[in-house]
A protein has these predicted regions:
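An amphipathic, basic-hydrophobic helix/alpha-beta surface used to engage anionic
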Residues: 1-136, 177-182, 187-188, 235, ...
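A generic local structural motif
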Residues: 66-68, 164-167, 211-213
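Short amphipathic alpha-helical interaction patches enriched in hydrophobic/aromatic residues
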Residues: 89, 93, 149-153, 286-289
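A conditional alpha-helix N-cap/helix-loop micro-motif detector
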Residues: 103, 157-161, 207-208, 271
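Well-ordered alpha-helical segments embedded in enzymatic catalytic cores
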Residues: 105, 163-167, 274
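Short, electropositive alpha-helical surface patch
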Residues: 133-147, 307
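Von Willebrand factor
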Residues: 141-176, 188-190, 205, 231-232
Length: 314
């Protein structure tokens, strides 16, 4: 029996996101993500303007009238949604938690997919694979996916995207559309406000190289789109005096003086470098990405992504 609170929350997301799919994303998903080919539909009489290359000469000869072969897009796709459920995603300084944001984005993608008769699957991960839901169709299946993303309690705390991508390649037998939703925080690098940022950059370089290989392999097999979850407090420290910061994934804490202007400046520089390296990583392996922040409506970023992909395919 589903708890009343859970049912209401799933229902709210269903109403909100399905409305967005109808009003904002109608046609966008279909035009951007095409099927794997075409399949024969029917033979009909030739009409002015038809491509002469599609004429079926056997039927034309038999009937004495020109006929053409009509083909339709082989529409069915498999959409895999990979969601980072590590503890760093249970954070926000404004609006909603990154985990809540992930659930709503997953819902929009899932509803868009089933509206186009595509299959939807889910992989939730931390430093291990927490749950795998095989791809299926239908509203009931999508509601199950949303319910899991919203209320699943992970066993792991930290993040291992490489392991999630390797698991994806094991359980998928055909080319899929893959949405990888994560804050892309390498474990152990969340707390780095030190004035000397050299160790921080070295840690990022090491994590990037580990992830780069797995992401490149996955992107060759699938169409991978990274969706990054961000929060403004991860970029700027406020002047609040002596404060304690805790890394949600490792549990480590650090006591800092946030009134130190040099430290706040270094904190901002470190995180600016983190975002730049993340962008370089995606570009180096040809992975599209969408930056989502807790303080800005996510619909704008997703609409811009669809428009960019559509222009590129022309």
């Amino acid at each position: 029996m589903i708890p009343k609170e859970l049912f209401q929350k799933v229902r709210r997301i269903e109403i909100t996101t399905s409305r967005l799919v109808s009003d904002v994303f109608a046609g966008e998903y279909h035009s951007v993500f095409k099927g794997q080919g075409v399949e024969f539909d029917e033979v009909r009489e030739y009409q002015p303007g038809d491509d002469v290359r599609t004429i079926d000469w056997n039927v034309t000869a038999r009937t004495g009238k020109p006929h053409i072969k009509k083909f339709i897009e082989e529409r069915e796709l498999t959409v895999m949604i990979l969601v980072d459920v590590s503890l760093s995603c249970r954070f926000a300084s404004v609006n909603m938690l990154k985990s809540q944001l992930a659930a709503e984005i997953a819902a929009i993608l899932a509803f868009s997919a089933i509206r186009n008769n595509d299959k939807v699957g889910l992989i939730m991960f931390t430093d291990r694979i927490e749950k795998f839901i095989p791809p299926r169709k239908g509203l009931r299946h999508v509601l199950h996916v949303i319910r899991e993303v919203l209320y699943f309690e992970p066993e792991g705390h930290s993040t291992d995207i490489m392991n999630a991508l390797e698991y994806l390649n094991k359980v998928t037998t055909r080319k899929s559309i893959v949405f990888l939703i994560s804050d892309f925080f390498p474990s152990g690098t969340i707390l780095r406000p030190e004035k000397n940022g050299q160790n921080y950059r070295e840690g990022l370089n090491s994590s990037e190289e580990i992830l780069k290989k797995s992401l490149a392999i996955a992107n060759k097999r699938h169409d991978v789109i990274a969706i990054t979850l961000n929060d403004p407090r991860e970029m700027q420290l406020s002047d609040s005096g002596i404060i304690t910061l805790e890394d949600a994934e490792t549990g480590k804490t650090i006591l800092i003086d946030s009134s130190d202007a040099a430290l706040r400046r270094q904190y901002h520089q470190n995180n600016t470098e983190r975002l730049k390296q993340r962008e370089r990583l995606f570009r180096s392996v040809g992975t599209d990405y969408i930056d989502i922040s807790t303080d800005v409506p996510y619909t704008n970023a997703i609409v811009k992504f669809f428009a960019k992909r559509r222009r590129r395919k022309r």
